[in-house]
Each structure stands twice: as structure tokens, then as C-alpha cells.
Design a protein with these regions (language model features):
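Generic structural signal for helix capping and beta-alpha/helix-loop junctions
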Residues: 21, 44-45, 91, 116-118
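Acyl-CoA thioester-binding alpha/beta core of soluble enzymes
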Residues: 1-41, 71, 83, 99-109, ...
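Short secondary-structure boundary/capping segments
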Residues: 2-3, 47-49, 100, 121-122
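Glycine-rich phosphate-binding loop and adjoining beta1-alpha1-beta2 segment
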Residues: 29-61
Length: 199
């Protein structure tokens, strides 16, 4: 692992797609020791460009023994990152309440498109949906022409992963003073709307 400002910080990442892995890649690039929990039977981590700089363990989170392994990793971690739909981690027995029982200093980072609560919380969505609702899509492109979708740079990575990484770093700093963990609830639509605030 590389040294950097997050050297000595342990992160447990629950494998997902898009902004969660990108956030963990950034944390790893800053020196954090990231262990990614992959689903048993899924594709190899080596094929994922954003998986650089971290180790992986494959677990079946519907198996009580594997959940116990995950909780043991969480107990020794500084940070947890997950990007599932609201309620999934709680149903697995790995939500913030359960995790804080084994590690009260844990920074629990959550990434969703719409947030943990609200009318769209459980709706499916993708980067294009998040940047459209936040107004960013309308602002991209030339006047009088259709918008030019910016891949998933504005929503998933800009409004999502970067805001979650910034929240995690701030929470780690605060935990040094308070000795307490906290939940970072990063919604891609919120981060993208914040980016639009400078326009």
C-alpha cells in the first residue's frame, strides 16, 4: 500500500459499481488500507479498473458465518463504504446500528443516488437520472441543442464519489477530536446539485 495522508486508516468496502469503488480508489490512493468485500461467485476484482491498490475477500452476506467475518473486519476498521439501496445493509445485519455496536468509532459511508429517505429513495436510477433531476444535464451542451451527457463524471464521480470521500476525510478528522464515529449519507443528486450551485 502507498503511504499518504490516510496511511494507517483501514477501510472496509462493500463491493458495488460506479461511485463507491471510485471513492475507495481515491482513499487507497491517499494511503488507506482498503479491503473490498466481494460477493462469492462474482467476477474477479483484477478486471475492475477502480479496484487498484486494495485487497479483496469474497463473502456470502446471506450466510451468518460470513456476516460474522464481515463484522470482524468492521471491528478493526476506521471506515466502511457501501453503495446499496436503502435498507439492504440493515437487512444483512450490517447497518450503521449493528456496525457501531462492534466499533463505535466507525465512519460509516453510504452512497445512494437519491438518499436514504424521500420519495425516490427506493427507486432505481443511474447517473443520467441524477444529473437530469439536479439540473446539471440541462446546463451541459450548446444552447438550442440537446444536452451532451458527460459519461458518468458529473453525477457518479463528481457529485457522488468525491463528496463521499470528502465527507469521510472530514469525519476522520473530527473523530480524532471526539473519539466518535458517524454516518456519512452521500446522495449523488445532492452532490450534483451542490456542484451546480457555482453555475
Amino acid at each position: 500500500m502507498a503511504s499518504g495522508p490516510l496511511d494507517g486508516v483501514r477501510v472496509v468496502e462493500f463491493a458495488g459499481i460506479g461511485p463507491g469503488p471510485f471513492c475507495c480508489m481515491l482513499l487507497s490512493d491517499m494511503g488507506a488500507d482498503v479491503v473490498r468485500i466481494d460477493r462469492k461467485g462474482r467476477r474477479a476484482m483484477a478486471k475492475d479498473v477502480t479496484a487498484r491498490g486494495r485487497r479483496s475477500v469474497a463473502l456470502d452476506l446471506k450466510d451468518a458465518n460470513d456476516v460474522a467475518v464481515a463484522l470482524a473486519l468492521i471491528e478493526k476498521a476506521n471506515v466502511l463504504i457501501e453503495g446499496f439501496r436503502p435498507g439492504v445493509m440493515e437487512r444483512l445485519g450490517l447497518g450503521p446500528d449493528q456496525a457501531s455496536k462492534v466499533n463505535p468509532r466507525l465512519i460509516y459511508g453510504r452512497m445512494t443516488g437519491w438518499g436514504q429517505r424521500g420519495p425516490l429513495a427506493h427507486a432505481a436510477g443511474h447517473d443520467i437520472n441524477y444529473i437530469a433531476l439536479s439540473g446539471a444535464l440541462y446546463a451541459i451542451g450548446r444552447m438550442g441543442q440537446p444536452p451532451s451527457p458527460p459519461l458518468n463524471l458529473v453525477g457518479d464521480y463528481g457529485g457522488g464519489a468525491l463528496y463521499l470521500a470528502m465527507g469521510v476525510c472530514a469525519a476522520l478528522y473530527e473523530a480524532q477530536r471526539s473519539g466518535k464515529g458517524q454516518v456519512i449519507d452521500a446522495a449523488i443528486t445532492d452532490g450534483t446539485a451542490s456542484l451546480m450551485g457555482v453555475m
